[in-house]
Amino acid sequence: MEAQSATETQKNLKTLMELIKTKRPFKSSDFDTLNLDYLSGQSNEELFKLLIDAINGMKENVAKVNEYLTEEGDHSLSGDELLKFVYKELVYDDESEFDKEKLQKLYKTFSEDSNAFATLQSYIQYLQPEENSQRWIQVHEPVKHRRRLNHNPALRVASPTEQSRCPISRRVVWIPSSVLNPQ
């Protein structure tokens, strides 16, 4: 390890240690100024898995808030008081970082078109890896240069019946097994 990078690494570790000590992994002011530079070195597959985890986490938080607001019991709080209580109990336990406008903007983003969010989450459940499952979709790095493809008469566009079997994409190229496994 080079001396310069070792010093920089030590500085970053000390900063991380201070963040862990104060137990403040994020604050509400980070919602609109999030720095995602730490993601730049990760592969597309890792980024895709992080996206899946983030969407599942958002769904769980939205479900917790909806469950609390729809359950029977004492709901004497209303307006800002209710928002602060729900935020502290179900989202993040540091009220000093509570910012009503930013929190409303965050929830508005997820609640404006909840049908689209539910559809996205259902596809994410399909893509999520399971133990001993062949269902996980392999993510490939994008090709840097376009290559000219030779026309192969054995390749054809999938029929509507074949396309309906594929839940993710409706445009599929069907490759006969004779092309994949020549005798």
UniProtKB/Swiss-Prot annotation:
It comes from the Eukaryota. The sequences of the gene BABR proteins are nearly identical, differing only at their carboxyl ends. This is Gene BABR protein 2.
